[in-house]
Design a protein with these regions (language model features):
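N-terminal module-boundary/linker segments of secreted carbohydrate-active enzymes
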Residues: 34-71
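Bacterial N-terminal signal peptides
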Residues: 16-27
Length: 462
């Protein structure tokens, strides 16, 4: 099965159905790639056509008996971390790899998946030469390598020219997640200095592997799957189904389906696909918080966006990670509140039991909270490390001053000792020299210990 073509076609049909179901008028507006730099950015802070700078206002589809409420997302004036996003397979261009034009399908998915993260971070999203819906993603091939190298070029540009030592979160979905995973494996995981700034990754739908029952040791040597609320430096990844994935499911299993990494396909007897539950790792109770932009359901709105196009649907879906028959997946079910007649947003765009297409937006609210918790934990740790470093460096300065004074005292006493004539005076001076040398040795050991602690903390400080 050509996963790229199949997923892309299902996505287009499903979105058309969903748009019709809610009677949302939309049409396609042309867009061209900007020029003048090595990277074409579809989202970049301060850029005139930054697609992630649009409205994030909206309200809920409330549960039965409750009133609609504003979603309440706002943008921080100076977010402490960045997000780097790679979009999923969307290009409908004829060749195996897309050019860098900002085509409507790409603009639509960038708004749907990435824009809301601007409530947590500065979002950078490069255009890249992704494998198109007409390309082949069944295995690693030339087209996949072209796409990855293009995405990698954007990431290197971001690190070199925009990161400025800040913490960063990697975001992706499907093909975008697979390229994010390779960026982690080949760049982040291998560079301790970069791992210090790695706040986390959100990369659903890409079959990232770990040893069965473990958090680390598969595709990545150092970066683990997230397992605790507020944990940073880890990966959120999952594949969503509402039933046991079949033996030929493209996601959730390693013996079949999506695998476009240079590494050999792992042995499913020893390894499994990561499943991290976003509805628990956000500190919640297992219920999803979907977020959907209704202006961009079908395409790019011809008349521009409305003021408040986002809709949430709390307490409609519940999820849990499950293992069965070689699959490891995020199992979706309905909460089933009495009298709940709200639209089943996920089923409208799913492919049977496979919820790959909507799995980011179905958990968008949870993912935003996870990103915020990771950012908060990272910043708190960095602030604590910086404060501790300041304290230790002050102690080091005091220690050096004490040692210098002690040495002066020893030199002065030694000179006196050389000139002393009486035995009693010489013995007293010797005792004082010996005592000061002991104190100097203690101070030197304290300085050595302080330097070691400072070095350890500096290695943890971004």
């Amino acid at each position: 099965v050509n996963a790229s073509r199949t997923i892309g076609n299902r996505s287009r049909l499903a979105l058309a159905c969903l748009a019709t179901a809610f009677a949302v008028a939309a049409s396609v507006a042309p867009a061209t790639a900007s020029a003048g730099s090595d990277t074409t950015w579809i989202c970049k802070p301060g850029q005139a056509d930054d697609l992630c700078a649009g409205t994030i206002k909206g309200e809920t589809f409330p549960p039965p008996g409750e009133q609609a409420e504003p979603l309440g997302y706002t943008r921080p004036k100076d977010p402490p971390v960045d997000c780097f996003y790679l979009y999923p397979t969307q290009s409908e261009q004829e060749g195996p790899n897309s050019n860098l034009d900002k085509d409507p399908p790409i603009r639509r998915v960038v708004v749907q998946q990435a824009r809301m993260f601007s409530s947590v971070c500065d979002v950078y999203a490069p255009m890249y030469r992704q494998v198109t819906n007409n390309g082949d993603q069944t295995k690693l091939n030339h087209s996949v390598e072209v796409a990855y190298r293009s995405a990698r070029s954007g990431f290197r540009d971001y690190l070199r020219n925009y990161n400025d030592g800040r913490g960063f979160i990697l975001l992706g979905h499907s093909q975008g997640s697979a390229h994010v995973a390779r960026l982690i494996e080949e760049i982040v995981d291998k560079r301790p200095g970069l791992r210090k700034r790695f706040v986390g990754a959100i990369a659903p739908g890409a079959n990232i592997s770990v040893p069965i029952g473990k958090d680390v040791g598969g595709l990545f040597d150092h970066v683990p799957a997230c397992s605790e609320v507020g944990q940073y430096g880890c990966v959120i990844a999952y594949s969503t189904f509402d039933a046991v994935p079949g033996p030929t499911a493209p996601f959730s299993r390693l013996d079949f389906g999506y695998w476009i990494y240079p590494d050999p396909r792992p042995d499913p007897a020893s390894f499994e696909v990561i499943c991290t539950n976003p509805a628990l790792l956000d500190g919640g109770d297992g219920t999803l918080e979907p977020l959907v932009n209704f202006d961009y359901l079908f395409g790019v709105p011809a008349g521009g966006e409305t003021e408040s196009p986002w809709r949430g649907e709390p307490d409609f879906y519940r999820v849990e990670c499950k293992r069965q028959d070689g699959a490891h997946w995020l199992n979706l079910s309905k909460v089933g509140l009495p009298g709940d007649s709200r639209p089943d947003l996920g089923a409208a765009v799913a492919s049977g039991s496979n919820y790959h297409v909507p799995e980011v937006n179905l958990a968008e609210g949870n993912l935003l909270r996870i990103a915020q918790l990771q950012s908060d934990s990272y910043e708190a740790d960095q602030a604590a490390i910086a404060a501790k470093l300041k304290s230790l460096k002050a102690k080091l300065g005091d220690g050096k001053q004490r040692l210098a004074e002690r040495r002066k005292t020893i030199d002065r006493l030694t000179r006196k000792l050389r000139k002393a004539e009486g035995q009693k005076q010489r013995k007293a001076l010797k005792r004082r020299v010996k005592a000061n040398r002991k104190k100097a040795a203690v101070t030197r050991e304290s300085i050595r210990s302080l330097r070691e602690r400072i070095s350890e903390l500096e290695q943890r400080l971004a």
